[in-house]
């Protein structure tokens, strides 16, 4: 294991990250305020004329230590921060600025990683849709898939210990420990998703920072194992993992960890060029071409390593290995599965001809119609059966605002589900939104749907066209075949970075 020592050592320059003095800089809090992650405008409630100075921050830190303002309960997350006194005010103010400060070394390493790998359009790799072309290319050659929930730490202190190998500033980490470890009382007696929800609502930026560092530490195990058994380098890994090293756990160096957990007799199990990993929304996918026995080896080795040496909670019994041809994945809003694509090929050799049936596997991405209708029913666009209804809360708005809201939602859904291999479900969603829009307008003008449609005609339906549909209708006004081919084809957009709520206007 001596050849791994240079790989496992901490970077020298990381030892010179002194971030604590930045806590007392006014522009840090102005920067955190401009990001707008917390819309409650916390600085307005302090009475210091929207400015943060050295004296103000010292007072806030002193009050945090002297008074019990860090206890977070379920009632605090629903408290109106505009009314009265908010006991989490001080911690929220400083945690926002502190999160911006700790992000500085991460941003610098990301920029240096992009420059080293000569990645020009890294924003394309951050798109949600960029995952699907990868799956289309790799999944037809794989046999088994496992949907794994990313393990969570057994205590918030683990998040601080993970972050201390990224940020070499004890003073800053002591303050981070104050925000994290003392902010949750009786951690072991509470349910983790509930704590995650409360903590993310009260300190969203700080929570994302801690969670991303935890995920990066969790994924560094996979990158470490892969890099040891393949001579070629992975350029893309430098973008997502700026740190790839391990450290001592319970006085045992990492060399002994791998020597004990992965003896030489079983290391060949990891020499699998067809093992692929994808992460999404707190879950991850492990897919392989191997037999189930080897995948089970992967599962138990990784789970044991995560539990014993990364202090995270994960159970092998909750990880299921499924045959890819018989299993569908609920993946980023799509139902993805493998289906055979049959084709007939005729081969001519001299005077003889042969007809051969070729069956090729193809990734099938479907629109989840039932969950989408449930979401539309939840925000009162239709009932539980999918029948459109009027949006009564929007009836007081102008006609332009009503149409604009419906059109925006319809176009966003069409944009996101443009990669669907079957568009009939998407057409039904568009129909619900169009008719709901008409019913809302008819309700506002105290008219019937039929009368209102006669008055507007086809102008209203044209508003619901996407940009691509509108351009094609102008180029080919009489040719419907081109539009049909466009609807059938799958298009993945590289400008989608998050999945917004259907309705975010209210």
From Swiss-Prot:
Localization terms from the record: Plastid, Chloroplast
Pfam families cross-referenced by the UniProt entry: Intron_maturas2 (PF01348), MatK_N (PF01824)
One Gene Ontology term, aspect cellular component: chloroplast
Chief location of this protein within or outside the cell: plastid
Keyword field: Chloroplast, mRNA processing, Plastid, RNA-binding, tRNA processing
Gene Ontology terms for molecular function: RNA binding
GO BP term, example: tRNA processing
Family to which this protein belongs: Belongs to the intron maturase 2 family. MatK subfamily.
Purpose of the protein: Usually encoded in the trnK tRNA gene intron. Probably assists in splicing its own and other chloroplast group II introns.
Protein name as it appears in the record: Maturase K
Organism in which the protein naturally occurs: Rhodotypos scandens
């Amino acid at each position: 294991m001596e050849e791994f020592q240079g790989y496992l050592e901490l970077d020298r320059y990381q030892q010179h990250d002194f971030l604590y003095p930045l806590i007392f800089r006014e522009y840090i809090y102005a920067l955190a305020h401009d990001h707008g992650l917390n819309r409650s405008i916390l600085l307005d409630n302090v009475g210091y004329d929207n400015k943060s100075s050295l004296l103000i921050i010292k007072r806030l830190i002193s009050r945090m230590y002297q008074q019990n303002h860090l206890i977070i309960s379920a009632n605090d997350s629903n408290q109106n921060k505009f009314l009265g006194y908010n006991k989490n005010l001080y911690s929220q103010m400083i945690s926002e600025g502190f999160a911006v400060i700790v992000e500085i070394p991460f941003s610098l390493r990301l920029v240096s990683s992009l420059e080293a790998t000569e990645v020009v359009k890294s924003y394309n790799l951050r798109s949600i849709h960029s995952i699907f072309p990868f799956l289309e290319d790799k999944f037809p050659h794989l046999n088994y898939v496992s949907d794994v929930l990313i393990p969570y730490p057994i205590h918030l202190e683990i998040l601080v210990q993970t972050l201390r190998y990224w940020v070499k500033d004890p003073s800053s980490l002591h303050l981070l420990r104050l925000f994290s470890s003392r902010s949750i009382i009786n951690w072991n007696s509470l349910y983790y998703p509930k704590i995650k929800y409360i903590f993310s609502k009260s300190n969203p930026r700080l929570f994302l920072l801690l969670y991303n560092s935890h995920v990066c530490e969790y994924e560094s195990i996979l990158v470490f194992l892969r890099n040891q058994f393949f001579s070629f380098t992975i350029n893309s890994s430098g973008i997502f993992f700026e740190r790839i090293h391990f450290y001592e756990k319970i006085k045992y160096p990492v060399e002994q960890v791998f020597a004990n957990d992965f003896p030489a007799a079983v290391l060949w199990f990891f020499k699998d060029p067809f093992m692929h990993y994808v992460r999404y929304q707190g879950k991850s996918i492990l897919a392989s071409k191997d037999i189930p026995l080897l995948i089970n080896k992967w599962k138990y080795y990784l789970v044991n390593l995560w539990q014993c040496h990364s202090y995270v909670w994960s159970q092998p019994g909750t990880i299921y290995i499924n045959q890819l041809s018989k299993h569908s994945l609920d993946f980023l809003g799509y139902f993805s599965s493998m289906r055979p694509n049959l084709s007939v090929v005729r081969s001519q050799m001299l005077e003889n001809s042969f007809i051969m049936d070729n069956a090729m596997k193809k990734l099938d991405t479907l629109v989840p119609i039932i969950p989408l209708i449930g979401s539309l029913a939840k925000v009162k666009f239709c009932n539980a059966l999918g029948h459109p209804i009027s949006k009564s809360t929007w009836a007081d708005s102008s006609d332009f605002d009503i149409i604009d809201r419906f059109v925006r939602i319809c176009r966003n859904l069409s944009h996101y589900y443009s990669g669907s291999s079957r568009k009939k479900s998407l057409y039904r969603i568009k129909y619900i939104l169009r008719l709901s829009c008409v019913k809302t307008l008819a309700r506002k003008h105290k008219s019937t749907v039929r009368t209102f449609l006669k008055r507007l005609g086809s102008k209203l339906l044209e508003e619901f066209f996407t940009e691509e549909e509108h351009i094609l209708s102008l180029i080919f006004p009489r040719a419907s075949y081109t539009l049909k081919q466009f609807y059938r084809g799958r298009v993945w957009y590289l400008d989608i970075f998050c999945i917004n709520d259907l309705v975010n206007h209210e």
